[in-house]
Amino acid sequence: TKFSQLSIFSELNNITNISMRDDYAGICGITKEELLGNMSEDINALAEAQGLSREEAISKLKENYDGYHFSPVSPDVFNPYSLLKCFDEKNFGAYWFASGTPTYLINMMKKFEVLPSDISRVEADESEFDAPTENMPTILPLLYQSGYITIKDYDKEFNYYTLDVPNKEVKVGLTKALIPSYVTPNTLATTNTARRIAQCLAKQDMEGALQLLKTYLGTVPYCNDTRYEGHYQQVLYIIFSLLTDYLVDVEVHTPHGRVDIVMLSRTNLYIIEVKMNKDAQTAMQQIDLKDYRQRFALCGKPVVKVGINFDSDKGNIEDWEIE
């Protein structure tokens, strides 16, 4: 991690900071060119072991372990630890997360009152994330310097960066780590439910997916946040984020308001509005009144509207509507 310049009484002083320089951006990882040029035999062996074509194996390596950027003009950088472990074991595992438990990170997220969805698509200037962690005013320096988020875009005109989770390995691992703090101590039950929900959505069965979700939430212990509508939004965000082939975002801006949750699958785009102690019809009416569907008319996929109403006393879904 980055640290402040030491005092004039220290032997180590006047350090040159190279952490955001383009000419050093690929020094701490493996670029795609290095992967293809130096590890071709490893790729072929992995593909054969997994029953994949060479191109499919490369695509899965990129999906799982690529995506790091360390400067405004940075090559895509693979996580070297996970990449080498994958080649060694010939399996697409979550190796980086298996090497340690992010307990400190979770505690700091609570301290700074960071919600799980707050980690996605963060806009910041350089001083807000490339900064010493000992006196950080936000959690961004810790998230960035420990590898949980990375640079995904840079706006040169306005000099700000967009930060996000780098890849599937980090996304799934971090989401699983957040489950005990935000949903239930039973992480296995949550991941199994997410897997069954994914199977339903693959068949475009949102009705079955919501029934599974309701059954699952009926097993979750009561917590004090169930009277807060945003709590249910975060629960849905965590569970849907475990659906690894889906893009999930919350509080998505439209010309007429903000959609609670937007989820993009291979076949559909889902607009999800969450209400508490009202009814699903009210949620659906808001989607129509604010004309949320128009915002996504050019996405190229059928748009499905989903209104969900939660009962705060039960801490569970009361009813829903799907169109």
Regions found by a protein language model. Give the residues of each.
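Mg2+/Mn2+-dependent nuclease catalytic core
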Residues: 276-293
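Conserved catalytic cores of phosphodiester-cleaving nucleases, focusing on short active-site segments
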Residues: 236, 259-276, 290
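Hydrophobic/aromatic beta-strand patches that form the interior of the parallel beta-sheet core
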Residues: 16, 270-272, 304-308
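Switch/connector loops and helix/strand junctions flanking conserved nucleotide-binding motifs
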Residues: 3-10, 280-283, 313-319
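Domain-level recognition of nuclease-like catalytic cores that cleave nucleotide substrates
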Residues: 295, 299-323
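Phosphate-binding site recognition
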Residues: 1-228, 243-244
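Active-site metal-binding core of divalent-cation-utilizing nuclease and nuclease-like domains
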Residues: 239-267
